[in-house]
């Protein structure tokens, strides 16, 4: 079982499975009661999602709002929703996604596709700005997996790792 494997070299590190790798669903998944009852405590739409929708609308010229302000409000609202501190530093960060390194099989290593940082740059082209907005929206949508998936299918963002089993996706 991949999750119960003990390896002292990985102690204290995040262990995850890259999208597209092949594992039987019985190794990692079960149907949650959350998905089979009539009501839910899960958010259907959050204030941060609304801010990101407004940022996208402004970027596309559908409103007179300032896309940078809406973008920053979206990130800030998401941080506040989840009780996370440091939003000011995050919004100034120029850090980008790291490459994926598989410590067990280097054939799975892959360069990060997402090349945008959280910091807004008014000189970026429209597509880069859209990538920033949607990438942050996707992060803020936790735990709305289905909505985040639909957003990624709609826009192509965030640029995630290529699925090993579906290289043409």
Which positions does each model-derived feature cover?
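Hydrophobic-face positions in mid-chain alpha helices that act as interaction patches
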Residues: 1-54, 59-60, 65-123, 128-130, ...
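Short, small-residue-biased leader/transition segments that mark boundaries at the very start
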Residues: 2-3, 166-168
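An amphipathic alpha-helical core segment
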Residues: 152-161, 165
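Bilobed periplasmic-binding protein-like "clamshell/Venus-flytrap" ligand-binding domains
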Residues: 139-154
């Amino acid at each position: 079982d991949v999750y119960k494997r003990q390896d002292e070299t990985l102690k204290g590190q995040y262990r995850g499975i890259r999208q597209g790798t092949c594992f039987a669903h019985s190794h990692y998944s079960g149907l949650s009661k959350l998905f089979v009852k009539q009501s839910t405590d899960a958010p259907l739409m959050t204030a941060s999602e609304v801010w990101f929708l407004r940022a996208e609308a402004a970027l596309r010229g559908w409103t007179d709002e300032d896309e940078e302000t809406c973008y920053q409000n979206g990130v800030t609202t998401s941080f506040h929703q989840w009780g996370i501190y440091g939003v000011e530093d995050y919004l100034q960060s120029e850090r980008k996604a790291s490459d994926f390194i598989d410590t067990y099989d280097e054939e799975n290593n892959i360069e990060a596709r997402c090349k945008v940082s959280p910091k807004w740059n008014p000189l970026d082209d429209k597509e880069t700005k859209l990538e920033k907005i949607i990438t942050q929206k996707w992060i803020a949508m936790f735990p709305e997996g289905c909505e985040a998936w639909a957003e990624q299918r709609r826009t192509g963002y965030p640029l995630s790792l290529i699925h090993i089993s579906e290289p043409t996706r």
